[in-house]
Amino acid sequence: KKYQNDANVTRLLHLDSETLLSLCPAEDKLFEVSKSGNVETTFGERPIVEEMNNAYNTFQGNVEYNSGRDLLVYSCMVFPYVAVYKQSGLKDWKLVSELKGAWDYSMSEGKLKFASSSPRGASELALTEDYIVLLQRDDTVEESVPREKAGRDLSTLPKSLFVYDYKLNLKKIINMPFPILRLCGD
């Protein structure tokens, strides 16, 4: 299958052999569903509604789809935010759960800037049959890292797994003795 090179898309999921879901963080609607190359619908409100010219960087994140439950999970990497959407049809997606962390930001010259004390979001996301697993820093047991230093600096990788049910109730925090780069689930 040939993909179009779309610089606005940062994540791409196959919902079935002909249907793609794209995360488009610079757009007003975060998600686009296309079937056989034709856009069928867009959905997903931005968690921060102010107009900004750095939305592409601000709303990048991870998306995973649980086909057994028809649920899409989105987690933002730049700030703590998780959303769960229920699919009832190709064009019918409804926000069913949302988890907003505490974040502090300001606007300057059209750019959204987070305070250095604001926590980052989950760096990875994985789904199991019954749980959402997020890789993120547990500030109660891990050293805090300045926002400027986090990112691709491997010395700042988180060591904690936050396990949620699909209603976004925290079930468990697993603090690992080593840093984690990637997650996968099945």
PLM segments and residue spans:
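Surface-exposed loop and turn segments in beta-propeller and other repeat-based domains
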Residues: 2-4, 40-58, 90-117, 177-179
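Repeated scaffold domains used in trafficking and secretory/extracellular systems
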Residues: 5-17, 55-63, 120-124, 178-186
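Short coil/turn segments that connect the beta-strands within blades of beta-propeller domains
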Residues: 16-18, 68-70, 123, 129-132
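Conserved beta-strand positions in repeat-built beta-propeller and related beta-rich domains
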Residues: 21-26, 66, 74-77, 134-136
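Short glycine/acidic-enriched loop and turn motifs that connect beta-strands
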Residues: 25-29, 79-81, 139-143
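Beta-propeller blade signature
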Residues: 33, 149-169
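Short consensus segments that form the blades of beta-propeller domains
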Residues: 72-75, 113, 148-154
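Short, conserved, GDST-rich strand-edge loop motifs in beta-rich repeat architectures
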Residues: 134-156
